[in-house]
Amino acid sequence: MKTFRIILITALAVLSNLSANQSEIVTATLILEAGGEHAEGAMQAVHEVILNRAVKRRLTAKQVCLQRKQFSCWNSGKIATLLAKAKRHPRWHEALVIVHSAPTNYTGGADHYHADYCDPYWASSLQKTRKIGRHIFYK
């Protein structure tokens, strides 16, 4: 519990420094990665991963989202096109609220996840924390 409190405090600091553009990129990441998921906590869980990585790697939330090969939704590199697509998604405002709300702890501190139909090489070296919808989370 103590670790979660430390991460929460640091994550709140990350959130308080979000510019409008950073907020849009993080919100778009939630939509593009989990907007089609209707499992409770799916978008919050992706948000947790972003914040946990930002804290752990000392990066901005936007830098975490746009890191090469980290979130498959951005792999094409067509940021403007993908951002416009995400903004048209019916759950855009829901995702925006998540981005500007206090972090949750659905994933138990996860900083990695993958879809349940994949078997990435790195999964066996991490501790599985939870499955939410079609995503499996690890730390």
Regions found by a protein language model. Give the residues of each.
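Bacterial extracytoplasmic/cell-wall-associated proteins, especially those involved in peptidoglycan
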Residues: N21-K139
